[in-house]
Amino acid sequence: MIISAASDYRAAAQRTLPPFLFHYIDGGAYAEYTLRRNVEDLSQVALRQRVLKNMSDLSLETTLFNETLSMPVALAPVGLCGMYARRGEVQAAAAADAKGIPFTLSTVSVCPIEEVAPTIKRPMWFQLYVLRDRGFMRNALERAKAAGCSTLVFTVDMPTPGARYRDAHSGMSGPNAAMRRYWQAVMHPKWAWDVGLNGRPHDLGNISAYLGKPTGLEDYIGWLANNFDPSISWKDLEWIREFWDGPMVIKGILDPEDARDAVRFGADGIVVSNHGGRQLDGVLSSARALPAIADAVKGDIAILADSGIRNGLDVVRMIALGADTVLLGRAYLYALATAGKAGVANLLDLIEKEMKVAMTLTGAKSISEISGDSLVQELGKSLPTALAPMSKGDAA
C-alpha cells in the first residue's frame, strides 16, 4: 500500500490489526457523534491565504515548559500502545525522540516507565489518572520522577469510563471476548507473529510493577473499572503536588471556567480535549471549544489541544484557533501499527512537510505568527460562535 499522506495510515492499520484492536483506537463513545465532529469541525476551519511574503526562513521550532520542540507537536498518552507494535511504546518514543518532540507514556502502557525512559535522550512525559488506589498513584509518580520524566499530564475527564459500544461488537469486551480475540489474531498472522508471540509480556507494565504480578487484558479492564474515582476534585490535584514539583498539565478541559480553575490552581498547562470522542458523546469538539478557552486564559497558562488532528494542516488550524502545541493520538497509533518506529517517523515527517506548506501559503514564518488572523470566514457561511474570534466580554 502506498503511503503518501498521514491519512493513509488508518487504512493500512485496519488491514494489519485484529478488529478488536483497530476498533478500540478507531471508535468512540455512544453513537460516536463527537468522534466524527472532532474531525469534521476542524476540517471546516478556513485559513487565510497570503502571498509574496518571502518565506525562505520559515521555522517550526517552539518552546514549551523550558523544552525546545522541533515543531509544536507531542505524542499523546495512549493506553495499550504496546499491543499495536512489538514493545510499541519503546518504538514510538524513539521516533518522537529522533524528531525532537516529547513522547507521553500512558499509565496503562504495556511497557513500564523503566523500560521506555532509558531508550531516549530527551525527558519523557508521563500521564496519570486519579484512581482510588492512591498508593499506586504515589508509586507511579515516584517512579516517573526517578526515571527523569519532565512533565506530568494529569487526565481529569475520566472519573468513569465512557460507553464504548463498538468494543462489545469488536471483541474487546462482551460475550466470548477472549475466544473472539484469539480467532482474530489467527486471521492476522503479521500481527500475531510480531506482537502476539514476540511482543510479550502483554501486561500493563506500570500496574504490574506495583501489584507484583502480571496484568493481562482482562485484568486491565477489571482493574480500571474498579479504580476510576468519581469523587475526583481539585483537592486531589493538591495532593499530587506534594509528590510532583515539575510541570503539570491538566488534560480534558472543554469549558472556559474549568480552564480558569486550572490557572487558579497553578497548573502549568491544559489540554483542550474530549478524550478523542471516547468519553461523553455530544460534547463540543475540541476545535469548537478551543477559541473560547484561549480567549479566557491565553498567556496565563500553556494551551495544548488534541482530538481530531490527523495531519499537519490540522496542527496549523489548532494553533490558529488558540493552541500553543497539539497532541497526536490516533494518527500516530495508526502509523505505529502499520510500520512501527519507521511508520511513526514517516508520519512525523509528513506532518512537518504539511505544516510547512500551510505556513508558507498563509504567510506565517514562525509558530508565533499563526493566530486568529490566519483564519477567514468563508463567503456565504457564518462561522459558528465557538469558532469565531471572541472578546473578553463574550467569553465570560
Curated annotation (Swiss-Prot):
Residue span, FMN hydroxy acid dehydrogenase domain: 1-380
Compartment(s) where it occurs, according to its Swiss-Prot or TrEMBL record: Cell inner membrane
Keyword Membrane: yes
UniProt cross-references to Pfam families, sorted A to Z: FMN_dh (PF01070)
EC number: 1.1.-.-
Keywords per UniProt: Cell inner membrane, Cell membrane, Flavoprotein, FMN, Membrane, Oxidoreductase
Topology of the protein relative to the lipid bilayer: Peripheral membrane protein
Cofactor(s) the record lists: FMN
Binding residues for substrate: 24, 129, 164, 278
Reaction(s) the record says it catalyses: (S)-lactate + A = pyruvate + AH2
Active site residues of this protein: 275 (proton acceptor)
PROSITE patterns given in the database record: FMN_HYDROXY_ACID_DH_1, FMN_HYDROXY_ACID_DH_2
Gene Ontology BP annotations: aerobic respiration; lactate metabolic process
One GO term describing the cellular component: plasma membrane
Chief site of localization: membrane
Alphabetized InterPro entries for the sequence: Aldolase_TIM, Alpha-hydoxy_acid_DH_FMN, FMN-dep_DH, FMN_HAD, FMN_hydac_DH_AS, LldD
Binding site for FMN: 106, 127, 155, 251, 306-330
Function in brief: Catalyzes the conversion of L-lactate to pyruvate. Is coupled to the respiratory chain.
Classification via NCBIfam families: L_lactate_LldD (NF033901), PRK11197.1 (NF008398)
Sequence similarity: Belongs to the FMN-dependent alpha-hydroxy acid dehydrogenase family.
Protein name (Swiss-Prot/TrEMBL): L-lactate dehydrogenase
Species: Salmonella paratyphi B (strain ATCC BAA-1250 / SPB7)
